[in-house]
Amino acid sequence: MIRFQLLLLFTFTLISNLFGQNKIKSGKINKVETQVSKLVGTWKLIEFSDLDTITGKWKYDYGKHPRGYFTYTKAGIVNLNISADTTLPISEDSARNRNVNLLKWLYNYSFGYFGTYSVNINKSIITHHVTGGSLPWFVDTDQQRPFILKGDTLIISDNKTYRHVLIKVD
């Protein structure tokens, strides 16, 4: 009889604790999750600029209207691709015989990388944990970027040396 009462008491306590924890979790709005969920989606690149420290003017290595998308998934995956507003006028056959300076290509025509991401809402920092892409020196690194979310606009910028502006498309 005592075993039955103890078993019943244990079962009641366990069920009460589980119900109480679920009720608290479901009734509480998690501000951090809400902010991170606003980042999830596909963002179209509309500006990619760097400050020329000699002239003090912003330069647009990929042109005034760069092409590209940044995608952040619910599962924590990031994928980004950037290319210049004008492509290199070359055929596939000609490309086989052309020598290309990799740095010039990457910094003037096209690059991309992928991996996972994490967000520190309190510091407004998004970190891209790069696992692959066209920038070999980024692979297996953490690329921290300050960001601001304003409605459907994502600004990734340190407000000093670089500025990347994107609008949400999905």
Sequence positions of predicted segments:
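Lipid interaction determinants
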Residues: L18-D170
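Sec-dependent N-terminal signal peptides
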Residues: Q5-T13
